[in-house]
């Protein structure tokens, strides 16, 4: 009824089990580290885009000083701002270079009334320019409630800069619940001084 057990076979079998366990633990640990590095890189990219979009919306807001009191946004200005954004992104050691940008401005018709009903968008001065495919989560035309009536007797113009970088499928799988690949976005809004 009893079987003879060879001591040498037990030692070999244990070593085989240890190697198999080591391989599983190694791959699980490597996968966990890959996820942590990806999450870190994703949020680092969002932080870079946030800083760049905030800087650019400040430039758009102050462009009357940069462009000789010209308050109307043009495609040439947007292309220059896009080049600046590309330069800022490269200087932040980002590997992505396929940056898309959308700049929106909203100006309001002159009125003496601070009533919200009298706040109307001036379509001759309100513009939206794209370089690449990039759409904000909320267009600036839906955020007009952020404008306030100034002491100078006018509604204050609004500016929005949205930056988009294409997301790798790895990011999309981790951070996107909708299933389709969406870019990493950052939007900044400013009011005129």
PLM regions and their residue ranges:
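Alpha-helical assembly-interface signal, strongest on the long, hydrophobic N-terminal helix that forms
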Residues: 2-85
């Amino acid at each position: 009824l009893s079987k003879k057990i060879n001591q040498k076979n037990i030692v070999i079998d244990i070593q085989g089990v240890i190697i198999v366990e080591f391989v599983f633990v190694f791959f699980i640990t490597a996968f966990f580290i890959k996820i942590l590095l990806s999450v870190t890189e994703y949020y680092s990219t969002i932080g870079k885009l946030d800083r760049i979009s905030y800087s650019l919306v400040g430039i758009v807001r102050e462009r009357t000083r940069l462009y000789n009191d010209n308050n109307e946004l043009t495609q040439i200005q947007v292309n220059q701002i896009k080049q600046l954004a590309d330069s800022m992104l490269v200087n932040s050691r980002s590997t992505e270079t396929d940056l898309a940008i959308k700049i929106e401005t909203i100006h309001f018709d002159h009125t003496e009334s601070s009533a919200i009903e009298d706040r109307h968008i001036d379509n001759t001065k309100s513009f939206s320019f794209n370089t690449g495919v990039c759409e904000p989560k909320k267009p600036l035309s839906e955020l007009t409630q952020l404008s306030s009536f100034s002491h100078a007797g006018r509604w204050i113009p609004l500016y929005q800069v949205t930056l988009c970088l294409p997301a790798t499928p790895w990011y999309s799988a981790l951070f996107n619940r909708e299933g389709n690949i969406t870019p990493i976005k950052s939007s900044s809004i400013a009011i005129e001084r």
